[in-house]
Amino acid sequence: MIDFGNFYQQIAKGPLSHWLNTLPSQLSSWQQESLHGKFKLWFNSLEHLPSLTPTTLDLNDSVTARMEPDISEGQREGIEKLLRNLMPWRKGPFSLYGVDINTEWRSDWKWQRVLPHISPLKNRLILDVGCGSGYHLWRMVGEGAMMAVGIDPMQLFLCQFEAVRKLLGDDQRAHVLPLGIEQLPELAAFDTVFSMGVLYHRRSPLDHLWQLKNQLVAGGELVLETLVIEGDENQVLVPGERYAQMRNVYFIPSAAALTTWLEKCGFVDVRVVDVCTTTTQEQRRTDWMITESLAEFLDPEDPSKTVEGYPAPVRAVLVARKPGIYQP
């Protein structure tokens, strides 16, 4: 099964060492009691992937691995078949020895919108909440992060991350743990915490903001990306049963309301740094994610609305800081 031993060793002598009081037993219980019905199938594909170390690795402009001399066509076909066993791939894209994983989301576009507005990630300890396949973790490593830790309870995403890691020379600068943020103690250890595409899935969004704050060091930075609507600080959309065909969407505030929420939770220096309508070029069906995507979730006669009649998805990026003096 998944071995978290390297992660335990890495955090044993740093600001996350106190996490070892609870984390190993949590993950041991998960492996014994909570595995998804398809986990063994996914893990089997992961085990059969070759361990490759790229001669060229680009994590700054993409997640791209190459080897000189190139791998054989047979090897490439075998890798692609195993990676396709881990579909659907939602966050990416990845280019691994000529296998191009064309994911549902152009997560690189989101990264381009976020990166200019945040503190440099060099030598920072980072938490990415709801990290999915871990695409952004690798981009954080590319920016010089000391370590990028992702959490996501979806076990398929863990297998996708470990598959990519295996093809990147078993790179130990990034890690994914199959946990939700509510399962984390108040670590107060991360220099930067990301929560992107999570807040609207939370029944209690203010509790989520408090949970994020509790993971930050004094003066640490929160990067929050979520759905928003137009309006003043009093405007919040509470959708009915579905929003853009998603059942689990609870609160979509205006950017102004979200700013107020962050301030109410004790964050300071709150900034709205980007607001962007999600397009069908950024989120779409591909041959690596073959089910419905954004185009099917919008009103075919008026793409400014969802099929339910709500405003179409608009996403904002906010940056805020936990009070205190930041000490790198």
Swiss-Prot record:
UniProt record, GO biological process: tRNA wobble uridine modification
Segments crossing the lipid bilayer: none
Residues binding carboxy-S-adenosyl-L-methionine: 91, 105, 110, 130, 181-182, 196, 200, 315
Source species of the chain: Pectobacterium carotovorum subsp. carotovorum (strain PC1)
E.C. no: 2.5.1.-
A GO MF label: transferase activity, transferring alkyl or aryl (other than methyl) groups
Entry keyword annotation includes Thylakoid: no
Protein name: tRNA U34 carboxymethyltransferase
Subunit and partners: Homotetramer.
Top-rank taxon: Bacteria
Family, similarity comment: Belongs to the class I-like SAM-binding methyltransferase superfamily. CmoB family.
